[in-house]
Amino acid sequence: MAKNRHLFTSESVSDGHPDKIADQISDAILDAIISKDPDARVACETTVTTGLVLVAGEITTSVYVDIPKIVRDTIKEIGYTRAKYGFDAETCAVLTAIDEQSPDIAQGVDEALESRSGNEIDAAIEAIGAGDQGLMFGFATDETEELMPLPIFLAHGLARKLTELRKTNKLDYLRPDAKTQVTVEYDEFNQPVRIDTIVVSTQHHPDITQEQIAKDLHTYLFPEVIDASFLDEDTKYFINPTGRFVIGGPLGDAGLTGRKIIVDTYGGYARHGGGAFSGKDPTKVDRSGAYAARYVAKNIVAAGLAKKVEVQVAYAIGVARPVSISIDTYGTSDYSEQELIDGVNALFDLRPAGIIHMLDLRRPIYRQTAAFGHFGRSDLDLPWERTDKAEALKKLIVK
């Protein structure tokens, strides 16, 4: 590797990975509830293991949803439909342990501190307080058209295409569980110049050879996802490097909601506040705050105000207004942090109810985000991925 160059690696997983099964079940339940009761409070956690699904959490709603049916339908859609996979949508046990949201939390969400103390500026927006304290990050970079870091973008692309090859029976020996990883080489100007390493581990039928899998992935997977200009004779490929991946899914490893937070976001390229997304209604700022921060970051880069930016927003439980907002452009902007923050505050309402209204979050849009990343999804119409405020933001800041 040339002097002053460096490597960065990100990973993704398929929709059949145990942790992603759990995420998708949690979000499928959330969608089912919020489609009937947009104001429901949902904090839904799922655990999957051999032959068993446990759904637990706190849900406050006036509607009924058939949780076992949602669980089985989700597992079936993912592709676990045979007992020999060690996990079958029809025969697995489904247990539920659901309580209501704590009234101590509810009182701070239902009526924010600003409203309770008489300091509200906008009564309708400040009536809702943050569902928890915490810090969230949003990130954007001009490395890709989607304004995402290249390593995670390619890792997601490989995982998504691999799933397509399985579900369309193009490669009918593939099974649902899989992981991908991409290492990108950056030059001295921090621009991606080549792919150094690709790792793919995919569950498969026991009778297929590793040589056939490797041949097929080089034919049907890599050329469909990765621009040939990034590949060279020194690019390394590791395909099922253990030599066998027959036992997978919940039979191989237990899965849990919220255990793939780096896969869900920026692949480690940006910081993470620690809060997971799936199974949480939009009053939970772990989710809505991170979506809003991405929305802000993406519009800053789309406006040409920075080449790369990380936005942090933080909240106190039961308080509507963020306790802090910070913006780091890594030296790629001609404008000060305060100039950018002033522009953001003028255009983006980062109070929980403001975010919910701005991004129209009381809708069943979450199940689709629970695999292959929440950001940079050009295959989906996600409100936090829009750059509709870029021009207005530019006019506010550029004098």
UniProtKB/Swiss-Prot annotation:
Residues at which ATP binds: 17, 177-179, 244-245, 253, 259-260, 276, 280
Entry's Gene Ontology BP terms: one-carbon metabolic process; S-adenosylmethionine biosynthetic process
Localisation per UniProt entry: Cytoplasm
Amino-acid positions noted as binding K(+) in the UniProt annotation, renumbered to this chain: 45
Keywords, comma-separated and alphabetical: ATP-binding, Cytoplasm, Magnesium, Metal-binding, Nucleotide-binding, One-carbon metabolism, Potassium, Transferase
Primary residence: cytoplasm
Binding-site list for Mg(2+): 19
Record: residues binding L-methionine: 58, 101, 253, 284
GO MF entry, a single one: methionine adenosyltransferase activity
Coiled-coil spans in chain: none
Pathway note: Amino-acid biosynthesis; S-adenosyl-L-methionine biosynthesis; S-adenosyl-L-methionine from L-methionine: step 1/1
Enzyme class: transferase
InterPro entries listed in its UniProt record: ADOMET_SYNTHASE_CS, S-AdoMet_synt_C, S-AdoMet_synt_central, S-AdoMet_synt_N, S-AdoMet_synthetase, S-AdoMet_synthetase_sfam
Cited Pfam families: S-AdoMet_synt_C, S-AdoMet_synt_M, S-AdoMet_synt_N
Residue segments, region Flexible loop: 101-111
Cofactor(s), names only, from the UniProt record: Mg(2+); K(+)
Annotated Gene Ontology cellular component terms: cytosol
Enzyme Commission number(s): 2.5.1.6
Catalytic activity: L-methionine + ATP + H2O = S-adenosyl-L-methionine + phosphate + diphosphate
Cofactor note as given: Binds 2 divalent ions per subunit.
Subunit and interaction comment: Homotetramer; dimer of dimers.
Family: Belongs to the AdoMet synthase family.
Function: Catalyzes the formation of S-adenosylmethionine (AdoMet) from methionine and ATP. The overall synthetic reaction is composed of two sequential steps, AdoMet formation and the subsequent tripolyphosphate hydrolysis which occurs prior to release of AdoMet from the enzyme.
PANTHER family: S-ADENOSYLMETHIONINE SYNTHETASE
UniProt-recorded name of the protein: S-adenosylmethionine synthase
Species, as recorded: Listeria monocytogenes serovar 1/2a (strain ATCC BAA-679 / EGD-e)
